[in-house]
């Protein structure tokens, strides 16, 4: 964990979050389900991701032996850091988001529904 190199810290949190089952189950998957089910625009999706970043980062720091509250995380991470993490995690889970969105709204996203075999009996 390197607080001096912001990009390394962001990359570490992103990689860790992508591999942490608890973060996925408690924050990442619910964010995907909410965003896809609500059929949010890209910018609204990023806004939802930004809301989860402080919680995920607090868990990251705690697992790294540096327990922090969400308020403390917000002092460590800049708005730009949170935005970078939100964009990165969205990118990591974009395909899962598209599949979930197609399951909720196959009529609005027929190409995605077909791509994921939704409603085709496959």
List the predicted regions and their residue ranges.
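Acidic interaction surfaces
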Residues: 1-122
